[in-house]
Each structure stands twice: as structure tokens, then as C-alpha cells.
């Protein structure tokens, strides 16, 4: 009986290890998919207990990013390869950060090759419910493969990430993050269009002249 129990536990441990490896392999294939994408545009929504935001996002490899929000109206987040700019119309304020590191901050938790590289390096992946596609939501007809990513160290801002990925396109449909303060943040991506040859000029943002500017809002340039 003792050896039967040991054998049963060994099978369970082996299956668990195989699940982790398979999930990591699938995440690697998603990362390869995003590494092959030159640019994309999509609709994006960001929700938490405190805010609900909607807008359109454009991204160009390796780290150019712009989000134009329709909610809040006129709010913008843009990174042009040199400067990260955030315009907050409610406060007539422009926050800017000029540093190569700012680009990594901008794309670290987004659907991008750089973001996926960060996830693979700093999180351990497993299937949320198994390797088979499941509904995106309880009543949704859209099927996705769900991964749960658990942080490897306490230094990560999100202690857990959940990804919903299209099994056909290997594009991320949803990212759910659980912060260290136990707050949930959800990013939804829809109407994704790939490789349209988005020009770099579209990532430049001219802020209103009347807005107040606050430089180096993340960190000092020499930090």
C-alpha cells in the first residue's frame, strides 16, 4: 500500500511538472508570435475597481507605443522611442520621462514581444484550467487558452497575471493582473490588426501648449 501511494504521488508530480513545461512551451510560442509582428493596432479597455478606461492602441516593434483614450476623453499615453508622455486632460498636466528605460516601463505589462519577454523571465507559467480552449467569459462563445503566471520574486508589481490567448492566432485577448495590494487590473484587446506599416510619426505626441509639464515623473534621468 505504501508503495502504491508513492507511485500515485509520483504520477501526480510528473503530470504537474509536465503541465508546467507545456504551459511554458505554449507561452514561448506566443512570445515567438509577437516577436514576428512588426506593428499592430487594436481597441483596448482597462478596468479596475477605481477606473474604467477605453481607447485605441498602436504598437510598433520594438517598443513604440501610443494609446489614445476615448474614456477619459483626450487622455494619451505615448512612447516615441525617446520620451514617455502621459497627458491627463482632467488636470491639464503632461507627465514626461526621457530615458531608454521609459520604453520598458511603457510596454512591460502589455501585449508585446518585450512584455512577453519580461513575463517569461519573471513569472512561472501554468495552465489555468488545462491546455484546451475554454470560453473567455462564462457566457462568451469566444474560446481562448488561459494561462496563470505566478511571480518568481517579491519585487514584481503584479503577484499574479492571467492571460487569455487565442488558440488560432496566438494573440493575447486579455491580461488580468493582481497587484501586491490585492487589486485587480484587466486589459482587454479586440479588433487587432497586424502589420499595417504604421509610421513612426504616429507615435509623436504634441501636448497642448497650455498644459502644465512635469518632467522625470518616474525617475531622474541619471538614476
What is each residue range found by the language model?
Residues 121-217:
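Gly/Pro-enriched, hydrophobic low-complexity segments
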Residues 57-110, 185-186:
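An acidic-aromatic
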Residues 52, 71-73, 157-160:
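Short, small/polar residue-rich loop motifs at catalytic or cofactor-binding pockets
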Residues 12-53, 61, 196, 207-223:
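N-terminal leader/targeting segments and the immediate start of mature chains
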Amino acid at each position: 500500500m505504501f508503495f502504491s501511494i508513492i507511485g500515485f504521488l509520483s504520477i501526480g508530480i510528473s503530470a504537474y511538472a509536465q503541465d508546467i513545461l507545456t504551459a511554458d512551451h505554449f507561452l514561448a510560442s506566443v512570445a515567438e508570435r509577437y516577436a514576428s509582428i512588426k506593428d499592430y493596432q487594436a481597441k483596448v479597455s482597462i478596468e479596475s475597481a477605481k477606473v474604467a478606461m477605453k481607447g485605441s492602441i498602436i504598437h510598433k516593434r520594438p517598443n513604440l507605443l501610443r494609446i489614445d483614450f476615448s474614456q477619459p476623453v483626450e487622455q494619451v499615453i505615448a512612447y516615441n522611442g525617446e520620451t514617455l508622455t502621459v497627458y491627463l486632460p482632467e488636470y491639464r498636466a503632461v507627465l514626461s520621462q526621457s530615458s531608454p528605460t521609459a520604453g520598458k516601463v511603457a510596454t512591460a505589462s502589455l501585449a508585446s514581444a518585450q512584455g512577453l519577454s519580461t513575463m517569461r523571465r519573471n513569472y512561472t507559467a501554468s495552465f489555468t484550467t488545462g491546455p484546451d480552449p475554454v470560453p473567455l467569459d462564462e457566457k462568451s462563445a469566444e474560446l481562448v487558452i488561459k494561462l496563470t503566471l505566478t511571480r518568481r520574486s517579491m519585487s514584481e508589481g503584479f503577484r499574479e497575471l492571467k492571460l487569455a490567448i487565442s488558440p488560432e492566432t496566438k494573440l493575447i485577448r486579455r491580461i488580468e493582473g493582481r497587484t501586491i495590494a490585492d487589486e485587480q487590473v484587466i486589459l482587454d484587446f479586440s479588433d487587432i490588426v497586424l502589420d499595417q506599416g504604421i509610421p513612426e510619426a504616429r507615435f509623436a505626441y504634441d501636448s497642448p501648449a497650455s498644459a502644465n509639464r512635469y518632467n522625470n515623473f518616474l525617475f531622474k534621468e541619471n538614476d
